[in-house]
From Swiss-Prot:
EC number from the UniProt entry: 5.1.1.7
Binding site for substrate: N13, N70, G80, N81, N167, N200, E218, R219, G228, T229
Protein name, as recorded: Diaminopimelate epimerase
A Pfam match: DAP_epimerase
Metabolic or biological pathway: Amino-acid biosynthesis; L-lysine biosynthesis via DAP pathway; DL-2,6-diaminopimelate from LL-2,6-diaminopimelate: step 1/1
PANTHER family hit by this protein: DIAMINOPIMELATE EPIMERASE, DIAMINOPIMELATE EPIMERASE, CHLOROPLASTIC
Keyword Ubl conjugation recorded: no
Transmembrane segments: none
Organism this protein belongs to: Prochlorococcus marinus (strain NATL2A)
Superkingdom of the source species: Bacteria
MF GO annotations: diaminopimelate epimerase activity
Catalytic residues (positions): C79, C227
Gene behind the chain: dapF
A GO biological process held by the record: lysine biosynthetic process via diaminopimelate
GO cellular component, one term: cytosol
């Protein structure tokens, strides 16, 4: 059966979007027969993407519900770049109109979004989670109220931190982000037993109090050009440790996100673009 799709990207973090509000796509994707999610996301034999977004009717009086799948078929709780892509899709299809606040239902809870054109989509990402039990992580809370510990990787002792934005994140500070063995460290740390549900991994280089560089190893995807929830988690940890202000530009391989955590309390706000790449139809 032929189904329409659109491909969107937020800072190069790309997604195949299906409107699943009036068909059986949700059931088909849940079954993932013959690993067809992986096939669709394959950049050589499929459409190619970091993940898939299904737009569904909300169960909680939100505008829509977002379900997301990683390229390996796993289902994460939330995705910051993905939710901006969903908003851009709805905007391009004239569904948003003059709404000033667009509530989206996700596996991580209700997320409030705002749009001023597809180049400028702001997301209230909710309050960060720093309780080790709720992240979850086996790292212990340090004196600054951030989960922290060390992990040994061959001859390296890595000082790591943790936070959650509805999904788990490990933060590792490095002096030269381009000089690390990224593939080796990322794949090892994603599956480390200090994170029972695996984790997204972010290598962070501090530029100054208002600017940081981040390189992303995404859980279930591997290297990606950006991670919205990860950018927020990084800002939460850097601001708690006094390495940045409560707002900073986060420079990822795919571009810049603006992240703010006012007064180090309440929700984190993320702002950035999401743009259409192309549309088509495919047999599923």
């Amino acid at each position: 059966m032929k189904n329409n799709f659109s491909k969107y990207q937020g800072l190069g973090n790309d997604f195949i979007i299906f409107d699943a509000r009036s068909n059986n796509l949700d059931h088909l994707f849940s079954k993932n027969k013959d690993n067809f999610i992986e096939h669709l996301c394959n950049r050589n034999f499929g459409i190619g993407a970091d993940g898939i977004i299904l737009i569904l009717e909300s169960n909680n009086k939100c505008f829509v519900r977002m379900k997301i799948y990683n390229s390996d078929g796993s289902e994460p709780e939330m995705c910051g770049n993905g939710i901006r892509c969903l908003i851009a899709f709805l905007n391009d299809n004239n569904e948003i109109n003059e709404l000033s606040e667009i509530p989206i239902e996700t596996k991580a809870g209700l997320i409030l979004t705002y749009i001023d054109g597809n180049e400028n989509i702001k997301v209230n990402m909710g309050e960060p989670i720093l309780s080790p039990l709720d992240i979850p992580t086996k790292l212990l809370m340090n004196s600054l109220k951030v989960p922290n510990g060390v992990i040994t990787l061959k001859d390296q002792i890595l000082n790591v931190y943790a936070a959650s934005m509805g999904n788990p994140h490990m933060i590792v500070f490095v002096n030269d982000i381009e000089g690390i063995p990224f593939q080796e460290w990322g794949s090892f740390l994603e599956k480390h037993n200090t994170f029972p549900n695996d984790t997204n991994v972010h290598f962070v280089e501090i530029i100054d109090k208002s600017n940081i560089k981040v390189k992303v190893w995404e859980r279930g995807c591997g290297p990606t050009l950006a991670c919205g929830t990860g950018a927020c988690a990084c800002l939460v940890v850097t601001s708690k440790l006094g390495k940045t202000l409560n707002n900073a530009n986060v420079y990822l391989p795919g571009g810049k996100l603006e992240v703010e955590w006012p007064n180090q309390s309440g929700p984190v706000f993320m702002q950035g673009p999401a743009l259409k790449v192309f549309s088509g139809e495919i047999d599923i």
